[in-house]
Every structure is written in structure tokens, then in C-alpha cells.
Amino acid sequence: YKAGFEIDNNHETLLINYAGAFQIKGDFENSKKILKILHEKFPNNIIAHKMYSSVNNYNKNIEHQTVMQNKLKNEKLSYFDKATLCFALAKSYTDQKNHKESSNYFIKGNENMFKTYKNANINKQIELFQKIKSEFELYKFENKNQNDEPRLIFIVGLPRSGTTLTHQIISSHSKVYGAGELPVLKNAFLKNNQLELREDALIKNLNVGKFSSKILSKFMVYDKNSIILDKAPLNFMWIGHIHLLFPDAKIIHINRNIKDTALSIYKNMFDASALTWTYNQEHLIKFIELYKDLMKFWKLKLPNLIYECDYEKLVNDQENETKKLIKFCNLDWEDNCIDHTKNKTGIKTVSLAQARKPVYKSSVNLYETYVQYLPFLIFHYLVQTEKH
């Protein structure tokens, strides 16, 4: 991107990608410089405003907040562009601790995103979860010792549950390559990115040796000499397949206060069109129920396989909880794992700036700050629930 920028800094897509690359690497100041060039040359690029908002501190400068508010007045904007600006504005008001305005904007953002994906259907998700359970209902897994060093480690759970923090901690180990959120398993088990299992992923058709070798080769592309760490949270759907294909793989389930998780999901805009359930309150609640039910199923089928990592314990007692994580992964202790902020692994997450900071406790019980502004379905339902 740097070479292309030096040749021609008038290319819109190049500028977006260049700014994005800086953000992934944690170089937010250079990202902002590129995004300011984008704003000047391509003022109607709405994505650039969202990217800028993710790394800008609106306590210090509200000029860009005003620019976005003026952009939002354009009635010709698509639902997607309106949503993008609304989520960016929500973040700006969060910086200013104006939670009422922040709530107002991310509710509007979700409404516009749901209009963008007007064909979103939670019933497809329900059918997929039922199919996965039916595949493994009668299957009896072999008991195998997991004393060897794994080739693969998976961090699973709901989005916004703490998977990025855990990823940065474990990938600080010298033997681990933090690959971020990989699409490898999703692509292996679903038909053309649809919510339907591939025929060769069904147990009756599954050639374990051939299938595992094929998938492992896709992981090893990233670093064949290291343990590959995949933090795609929705891999919780594939725990049965993971253990069947890779019995030595380590699976870590991040367990966070469900009310905080639901809030964090609802107040953020995701890149993936596969996460359309996040933009509708009833769909979000239903997906959480599906997730909890499937995790309960896996724990019954594989009682000693999954490591339960409590997010609140991790942020309150980082050293002891980190040592437990490293021990579970059959790795020797390294002091690097305590200070994950020195980890230069690229990060793609909706909370880029937070992921580069030391462990912070401000996200614990965050839902309490928003309940008064969000007297809607999510909290009528979730306030009654326990963690899991």
C-alpha cells in the first residue's frame, strides 16, 4: 500500500486499504493522516468517516462529529450509509460519556442495518443449529488424552465476549501464531457461505483423515512452524467437528456476562453480512438462546474438552487466569503473556483502540450504564437472565 500511495494518492480504494492496514497494526496516528486525505479527496466516502471514528477521541475534538451529523442530513443516503454514520456517531458520543445520545444513534444504526439486510431470516439459523445437534446427537466421541502440544487452538463464544483480549494474551507466546478470525471452518462446513451444511461435512459422509488434512493445510498456510490460534467466535458451532477432525486441538470458550455481551453486540456495527441477527433485538435474543443451548449440548457430549474462561475473572486477576490458560494449552510459561500490549500481531476487531490497551475493567457491568436509555426488549429479557 505504501508503494502504491507514493505513486498515486488519488486512488480511493488504495487509501481505504492503506488506512485499514495501519489500524490493524495499531498505528492509529498514521491511519488518521491517510483518512484525512480521504476526507479531502473523497468527501462522500462514508466508510472513511466510520474508520476515522474508531480511532479518534471525541473528548478532545468534536469537529468531525459535526461533519458526520451534517452528512447524515442527506436524505439520499442508502440505509447502509445511514447506519454507518449512526454507529460512528454513537461511538463519538460514547467517548463523551453522553450515553443517551450514543444509545439513540446505535438504535438508529441497527434499524438501518436491518433494512439493508431486509431478507435476514433467523429461521435459517435455527435450522442450522438443529441440524448440527442432530448430526452429533447419537455420535459417541472417543476419549483421548490431550497431553501433547496442540497444532491448533480455537477461542470461541459470542462476538464481543472477550475473544480478542484472550487472543492477544495467548498469541504473545513465542510458539503461537495469532491468526485472528479465520473463515477456514465456516468455509469448510457451510455451502457457499449459506446457512446450510455441506454434504461432505455430514458425519455419514465425513472422511476424517482426508478432510482433516485438507483443513489443516489451510491453517498451516499462515505459519507451518507455529501453533495456529483462531479466534473466530462463531466456531463454537463446530466444536463437534473440531474434536472429530483434530482431537488434540484446544478449545477455549469465553464466558462473559450475557447482558454486557448483548449490549456490546447491539452497539457495534460488524463487517460480516453473516451477522445480520445482531441488528434486530428479537433475532439477537434468539441467537443468544441458540448459542447457550448448543454450548450446553457440547458440554454434555464432551465434558472435559472445553476450557471455560471467565472474562470478568480474566480482567480482574489477569496473571493467575493467564497462567491457567497457558497451562491448558500445554505450553510452558512465558512472561510475555502477561503484557499483551507488546504483542504486534495484527488485529481486526470493532474495538481496535481498546484491543491495544492494557486490560481494562470499564467494560464489566457496562449494561448498567445503558439500561435507563434502553428500556426495550433486550433488557426486559436479559435483565432476568444469569450468565450461563
Residue positions per predicted region:
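Phosphate-binding active sites in nucleotide-utilizing proteins
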Residues: N143-F246, I254-N255
